[in-house]
Amino acid sequence: MYDYLKGLITRITPEYIVLEQKGIGWQLNTPNPFAFRTSAMEQQIYVHLHVREDAQVLYGFPNLDQRELFRKLILVSGIGPKGALAILATGNPQQVISAIEREDETFLVKFPGVGKKTARQMILDLKGKLGSLLETIELPSTEDELPLFGVHPYKHELEEAILALAALGYSEKELEKIRPLLEDNDKLETTDAYMKQALQLLLKLK
């Protein structure tokens, strides 16, 4: 069983990153690929190997807490790896854990593929079992805390974010509703920043 991979991130797409290690490029599906950056320095990515009948898929996470929450989410009936990635992509697992503990179905059904039945199942399966994660996960929750990396605000950053959100399962109708709000926000400079702001807006739609 793999625990983590350490290498150079050589490619970032809307669905996955490629981590090169000793001449081998590992394709890692991640919640938000644009939270990573290509770099000449080695990076350590925690991984989860998901085995299906037709494929073996590696999922990558920047820290152990995200991987642990992912593993708990995919144990819930009705939530597969893609659904778990969409939930984690908000960049704020605290919101998700808090919603489960409060039995807030209204919040949980805002994620792609999560209906009332699945939201109820999440609460039944996970309530009271995520306390340690809630204490250790500390991620940005407001726009002012989003990290900006000094990338010029070209439109392709927004388009990359839209593609990544579509890959997570958000509909074209939902994305078109928030696009004007993203286009008018001159504080957003990177694809990662667009992603995080877009996800917060999407959670307010329903």
Swiss-Prot record:
A GO-annotated cellular component: Holliday junction helicase complex
Q: Where is the segment annotated Domain III?
A: 153-206
**Biological process terms in GO annotation:** DNA recombination; DNA repair
Family annotation (InterPro entries) = DNA_helicase_Holl-junc_RuvA_I, Hlx-hairpin-Hlx_DNA-bd_motif, NA-bd_OB-fold, RuvA, RuvA_2-like, RuvA_C, RuvA_C_sf
**Is-annotated flag, keyword NADP?**
no
- SMART domains, per the entry: HhH1
- The region called Domain I is annotated at 1-62
Keywords of the record, alphabetical order, are: Cytoplasm, DNA damage, DNA recombination, DNA repair, DNA-binding
The region called Flexible linker is annotated at: 142-152
Region annotation (Domain II) ranges: 63-141
GO molecular function per UniProt: ATP binding; four-way junction DNA binding; four-way junction helicase activity
Any one Pfam family here would be RuvA_N
Q: Tell me the domain of life.
A: Bacteria
> Where in the cell?
Cytoplasm
Q: How does it assemble?
A: Homotetramer. Forms an RuvA(8)-RuvB(12)-Holliday junction (HJ) complex. HJ DNA is sandwiched between 2 RuvA tetramers; dsDNA enters through RuvA and exits via RuvB. An RuvB hexamer assembles on each DNA strand where it exits the tetramer. Each RuvB hexamer is contacted by two RuvA subunits (via domain III) on 2 adjacent RuvB subunits; this complex drives branch migration. In the full resolvosome a probable DNA-RuvA(4)-RuvB(12)-RuvC(2) complex forms which resolves the HJ.
What role does it play? The RuvA-RuvB-RuvC complex processes Holliday junction (HJ) DNA during genetic recombination and DNA repair, while the RuvA-RuvB complex plays an important role in the rescue of blocked DNA replication forks via replication fork reversal (RFR). RuvA specifically binds to HJ cruciform DNA, conferring on it an open structure. The RuvB hexamer acts as an ATP-dependent pump, pulling dsDNA into and through the RuvAB complex. HJ branch migration allows RuvC to scan DNA until it finds its consensus sequence, where it cleaves and resolves the cruciform DNA.
| UniProt similarity note | Belongs to the RuvA family.
Recorded hits in NCBIfam families, A to Z, give:
ruvA
- What note about domains is in the entry? Has three domains with a flexible linker between the domains II and III and assumes an 'L' shape. Domain III is highly mobile and contacts RuvB.
Protein name per its UniProtKB record: Holliday junction branch migration complex subunit RuvA
